[in-house]
């Protein structure tokens, strides 16, 4: 089998990035054909462009226009991006709540969504979307739940739902856009075609440990209770493994075709 070059972006604020980075590296290392380079943001555009696939776990990372164009062109050129949890989040803390500014349209249109809010962390149920029940990414996955951040987002372009939950109501005063009155599916996992390539987005994966809230403006010296998120669920790891396999498919298909 061919060598497969992955670029892993793990960085940002208010999450246990070290934990997520380690867990994702362990999963990537299960395949001896995969070689990984790691960054905290999108600044190493040369390494990103040279990779076979991209995987990310970030929160409130703000790429430049040039960096956004590089990741857009990376996917549009036929490659795949497995984006996790807060990759689609940028935040601005103001007196009336946390705003999610629409200042990064290229990034959000490439990802297919932008995070806007989440209710308080508590368990929520997740099911495979009926139209996707035979898709290899989710086939055979039984209904499950996780105690995590239930993402409320706006969407861009073509979206292929894979997994969903439901939420209606007020997500809480912490976020400026907190009124979500429509009782409709909230996507937990979806595919988003971009040119010749595709993005797979999977929203669970919150994790917070002792020192993760020290970043301003929150500046909490020590967080009192660890928040473990979906990482405690075997189903979460099963889906991560499937997502990584999905991301490798174009490279392996090209090698097989000679």
Give the residues covered by each predicted segment.
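Catalytic beta-strand/loop cores that center a nucleophilic Ser/Cys/Thr
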Residues: 29, 35-37, 49-50, 119-207
């Amino acid at each position: 089998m061919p060598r497969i070059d992955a670029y892993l972006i793990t960085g940002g604020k208010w999450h246990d990035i070290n934990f997520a980075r380690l867990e994702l590296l362990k999963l990537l290392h299960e395949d001896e054909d995969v070689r990984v380079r790691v960054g905290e943001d999108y600044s190493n555009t040369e390494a990103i462009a040279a990779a076979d696939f991209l995987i990310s776990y970030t929160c409130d990372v703000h790429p430049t226009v040039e960096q956004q164009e590089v990741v857009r062109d990376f996917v549009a050129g036929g490659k795949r991006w497995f984006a996790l949890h807060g990759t689609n989040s940028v935040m601005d803390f103001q007196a009336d709540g946390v705003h999610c500014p629409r200042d990064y349209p290229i990034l959000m249109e490439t990802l297919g969504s932008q995070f806007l809010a989440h209710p308080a962390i508590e368990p929520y149920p997740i099911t495979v979307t009926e139209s996707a029940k035979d898709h290899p990414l989710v086939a055979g996955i039984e209904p499950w739940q996780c105690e995590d951040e239930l993402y409320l987002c706006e969407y861009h372009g073509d979206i292929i739902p894979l997994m969903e939950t439901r939420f209606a109501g007020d997500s809480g005063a912490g976020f400026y856009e907190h009124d979500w009155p429509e009782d409709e599916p909230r996507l937990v996992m979806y595919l988003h075609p971009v040119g010749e390539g595709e993005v797979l987005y999977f929203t669970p994966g919150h994790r917070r440990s002792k020192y993760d809230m020290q970043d301003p403006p929150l500046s909490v010296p020590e967080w009192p209770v660890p928040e473990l998120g979906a990482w405690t669920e075997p189903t979460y790891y099963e889906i991560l493994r499937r997502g990584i396999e999905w991301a490798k498919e174009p490279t392996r298909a090209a090698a097989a075709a000679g």
